[in-house]
């Protein structure tokens, strides 16, 4: 039986603030020992009062604007009450019915063109601590360094239909957050986490009962959890069973979901307004000020790259990476007004040759010694006919190490040979060394000429233009 999946995502991003959202406790705890970044408010001690972090509010506003949301003029925090060891206050401060942003959208690439995913809301909240479960131990350990860190949670409408679309959406959200400087959005560091709500139904029938898969910490896990859970629900329904509204976890090792608890309803959390924080008024002037500080968004970069003549797949790749787009833009600007590097050729070199070489070193462009101006110069030397593509590839390791390609070409005498006399001499030597191939070519086997072409290029040290060699070789053979 064929089923259709209905999927919504809840994405949590840890905001780039120096201190936690409701206290002055430092928030840069990564790499620290357990429970080193706590304070009385983080620990939920009696008598402590929250103070809202202004930067967290502005980053949330910026993120909402980046998603095309309406920023609320009035918002407030509520206590979301629950009992769990990683929440020492026994409640989370979140924005219940007054989120800071709502009604946005994000267009993601699809097979038939852009596909729109609607954003229901984005709201601020404080993060929980972290439970560590030692293998085979009869206890768990609690680290509260993360507790109280500033989070923004973004909730989509149930517009997503499959794992690849979900992955494309998350990549776009990550690119927006990183481009704006709102969050590092690194799943491997826990700075971007995702919950998946998924149900299935037969075409034309009402939606089924949804389940929630919690705390997925990689885009690949999100995609695989969607695939597994859709298949599991289909198997249950085909066997005559029912789907219950549960909260599930994801077993990365077993590649399957598991039951965590029966899904709570809103009433279970007993939301009520936070009495120690006044409601927040956000003026149009404040919104305009934040909007004016926003850097270029990935969608704007994409349009700029398209206009420059970069092919769609490369433009998408560049626009989704802050480090690659920054490097590419600097390289593109580095040429003189009369000799700008070709936009597509530069993208080819950056995304293929450079990316491949750096991947082998387990580096990105931001970690390497490669200079944007040097890559632009390398592409420019090829375009100007000063060196061949082969010579450029041979020079790449040195260019990656920070050396100027123009200087290397001059020092090593690598400029393209334009002396046809030298090329003719190399051709004569190759023909004399392989008379059998010469006879084959003159006998009508034109493809056999490649057996002569290689030795000529080798004799010229790769410094002759291939088209010139082929032209001279053709003339020498009388073709």
Swiss-Prot record:
Query: Under which name does UniProt file this protein?
Result: Aspartyl/glutamyl-tRNA(Asn/Gln) amidotransferase subunit B
Q: Matching NCBIfam families, A to Z?
A: gatB, PRK05477.1-2, PRK05477.1-4
Q: Which reaction does it catalyse?
A: L-glutamyl-tRNA(Gln) + L-glutamine + ATP + H2O = L-glutaminyl-tRNA(Gln) + L-glutamate + ADP + phosphate + H(+); L-aspartyl-tRNA(Asn) + L-glutamine + ATP + H2O = L-asparaginyl-tRNA(Asn) + L-glutamate + ADP + phosphate + 2 H(+)
Question: Which SUPFAM superfamilies has this protein been placed in?
Answer: GatB/YqeY motif, Glutamine synthetase/guanido kinase
Per UniProt, subunit arrangement is: Heterotrimer of A, B and C subunits.
Which family does the entry's similarity section mention?
Answer: Belongs to the GatB/GatE family. GatB subfamily.
**Which EC number(s) does the record attach to this protein?**
6.3.5.-
First-tier enzyme category under EC: ligase
Could you tell me the Gene Ontology terms of the biological process aspect for this record?
Answer: glutaminyl-tRNAGln biosynthesis via transamidation; translation
* InterPro entries xrefs: Asn/Gln-tRNA_amidoTrfase_suB/E, Asn/Gln-tRNA_Trfase_suB/E_cat, Asn/Gln_amidotransferase, Asn/Gln_tRNA_amidoTrase-B-like, GatB, GatB_Yqey_C_2, Gln-tRNA_amidoTrfase_suB_CS, Gln_synth/guanido_kin_cat_dom
- Which molecular function terms from Gene Ontology are attached? asparaginyl-tRNA synthase (glutamine-hydrolyzing) activity; ATP binding; glutaminyl-tRNA synthase (glutamine-hydrolyzing) activity
**Pfam families attached to this UniProt entry:** GatB_N, GatB_Yqey
Stored PANTHER family: GLUTAMYL-TRNA GLN AMIDOTRANSFERASE SUBUNIT B MITOCHONDRIAL AND PROKARYOTIC PET112-RELATED, GLUTAMYL-TRNA(GLN) AMIDOTRANSFERASE SUBUNIT B, MITOCHONDRIAL
Taxonomic superkingdom? Bacteria
Q: What does this protein do?
A: Allows the formation of correctly charged Asn-tRNA(Asn) or Gln-tRNA(Gln) through the transamidation of misacylated Asp-tRNA(Asn) or Glu-tRNA(Gln) in organisms which lack either or both of asparaginyl-tRNA or glutaminyl-tRNA synthetases. The reaction takes place in the presence of glutamine and ATP through an activated phospho-Asp-tRNA(Asn) or phospho-Glu-tRNA(Gln).
Iron keyword on record: no
What are the entry keywords? ATP-binding, Ligase, Nucleotide-binding, Protein biosynthesis
Gene symbol of the encoding locus: gatB
